[in-house]
Amino acid sequence: MPPANPHLNHTGGCTKTEEEEAASSEEDSGSFHGSGVCKWFNVRMGFGFLSMTHREGICLDSPVDVFVHQSKLHMEGFRSLKEGEAVEFTFKRSSKGLESLQVTGPGGAPCVGSEKKPKGTQKRRSKGDRCFNCGGPNHHAKECQLPPQPKKCHFCQSISHMVANCPIKAQQLSPGSQGKSTTSTGEEEDMSHTPLLPESTD
């Protein structure tokens, strides 16, 4: 009875295990070298595909797709690839297809990468790149070429006061909010006094 179980479940565990063993032995047997260009790369998701034109130095008849994940890119900072960027890489054959192991620029140089950055990263960086001394872009206050500037109001840019005491900001806020509340309060007071007068006279 125990020997019959593997044969009954032939399409289940046994075959799958043999395929996995074959795939893992293929992966262990080594990696291959290829070169080509980046076909596409999603900077937000961090993966894409390479279009391999040469394998082990031999030109291929037609390009072959090789999966690439950002963790395999040889470069500093934010890792990404630019569409059409020339690359060299090592790759392996897996159950999912061809997957890159390490990706570099030509001659082992670092990858160039895409100018595109995920939207969240762009917003954070643009705020961080403003100088709080002069207000200029692309540098920080500690790197500013100008001497320390006087503190100024963030609302009207005047150096005579801070934003908390800004008269222009106070003027813009007061007509809308305070004017309406004063008028409605005044009307309520007038209306509350008006009904009392006729009742007291009668």
UniProtKB/Swiss-Prot annotation:
InterPro entries: CSD, CSP_DNA-bd, Lin-28_RNA-binding, Lin-28A-like_Znf-CCHC_2, NA-bd_OB-fold, Znf_CCHC, Znf_CCHC_sf. Residues 107-130 are annotated as: Flexible linker. Disulfide bonds: none annotated. A zinc finger (CCHC-type) spans 129-146, 151-168. PROSITE patterns: CSD_2, ZF_CCHC. Its main location: cytoplasm. One of its GO terms (cellular component) is P-body. Belongs to the lin-28 family. Zn(2+) 2 binds at residues 153, 156, 161, 166. Coiled coil: none annotated. SUPFAM superfamilies: Nucleic acid-binding proteins, Retrovirus zinc finger-like domains. Monomer. It comes from Danio rerio. Residues 18-29 have a biased composition (Acidic residues). It comes from the Eukaryota. RNA-binding protein that inhibits processing of pre-let-7 miRNAs and regulates translation of mRNAs that control developmental timing, pluripotency and metabolism. Seems to recognize a common structural G-quartet (G4) feature in its miRNA and mRNA targets. 'Translational enhancer' that drives specific mRNAs to polysomes and increases the efficiency of protein synthesis. Its association with the translational machinery and target mRNAs results in an increased number of initiation events per molecule of mRNA and, indirectly, in mRNA stabilization. Zn(2+) 1 binds at residues 131, 134, 139, 144. Residues 171-185 have a biased composition (Polar residues). It is found in: Cytoplasm; Rough endoplasmic reticulum; Cytoplasm, P-body; Cytoplasm, Stress granule. One of its GO terms (biological process) is pre-miRNA processing. The modification Phosphoserine is found at residue 174. One of its GO terms (molecular function) is zinc ion binding. It holds the Pfam family Lin-28A-like_zf-CCHC_2. This is Protein lin-28 homolog A. Keywords: Cytoplasm, Endoplasmic reticulum, Metal-binding, Nucleus, Phosphoprotein, Repeat, RNA-binding, RNA-mediated gene silencing, Zinc, Zinc-finger.
